[in-house]
Swiss-Prot record:
Function noted in UniProt: Catalyzes the formation of 6,7-dimethyl-8-ribityllumazine by condensation of 5-amino-6-(D-ribitylamino)uracil with 3,4-dihydroxy-2-butanone 4-phosphate. This is the penultimate step in the biosynthesis of riboflavin.
Entry's Gene Ontology molecular function annotations: 6,7-dimethyl-8-ribityllumazine synthase activity
Record: residues binding (2S)-2-hydroxy-3-oxobutyl phosphate: D90, T91, R132
The enzyme's E.C. designation: 2.5.1.78
A cellular component term, taken from the record's GO annotations: cytosol
GO biological process, one term: riboflavin biosynthetic process
InterPro entries reported for this sequence: LS, LS/RS, LS/RS_sf
Keywords annotated in UniProt: Riboflavin biosynthesis, Transferase
Gene designation: ribH
Metabolic or biological pathway, per its Swiss-Prot or TrEMBL entry: Cofactor biosynthesis; riboflavin biosynthesis; riboflavin from 2-hydroxy-3-oxobutyl phosphate and 5-amino-6-(D-ribitylamino)uracil: step 1/2
Name of the featured protein: 6,7-dimethyl-8-ribityllumazine synthase
Length: 161
């Protein structure tokens, strides 16, 4: 029986794209900072001159899937991370955006075979979003770690095939 696991120490040669929603950038900017900190601490070059990492900004979480799809289809990246924050309001807009963003991001991963980390916060209040982006913890760090694990796992699976 073979057992496959991703490792967090296998960042060399890994190309990562991060797609960030600009809407609620008070939150998404903090998620990005946490994500980049994690990647840097695990050996990914996150400098502006990096050939390992690219960051793409989109208007909002609804637009995350189309940008992620374009990047995944380019063949340049082994893993993508999507970062967004959708905060419930008084209208059904929240439900539409969350549903389409999550379905779209999942479809990109399925259709391209490139892992896409779902880093979209869905909260009832801005306070809850800020707590998840740095006040209590920064989920951006977790999303970076998930990307490293999935990139490493995919490499292990491809090597075995």
């Amino acid at each position: 029986m073979a057992t496959f696991e991703g490792r967090f120490t296998d960042a060399q040669g890994l190309r990562i794209a991060v797609v960030v929603a600009r809407f609620n950038d008070l939150v998404t900017g903090k998620l990005l900072s946490g994500c980049l900190d994690c990647l840097h601490r695990h050996g990914v070059d996150v400098t502006p001159e990096s050939s390992q990492l690219d960051v793409a900004w989109v208007p909002g979480s609804f637009e995350l899937p189309v940008a992620a799809q374009n990047l995944a289809r380019s063949g340049r990246y082994q893993v993508l991370i999507t970062l967004g924050a959708v905060i419930r309001g008084d209208t059904p807009h929240f439900d539409v955006v969350v549903a389409e963003a999550s379905k779209g991001i999942a479809a990109v991963a399925r259709d391209t075979g490139v892992p896409v980390i779902f880093g979209v916060l869905t909260t009832d209040t801005m306070q809850q979003a800020l707590e998840r982006a740095g006040i209590k913890s920064n989920l951006g760090w977790s999303y970076g770690l998930q990307a490293l694990e999935m990139g490493s796992l995919m490499h292990a699976l491809e090597s075995e095939a």
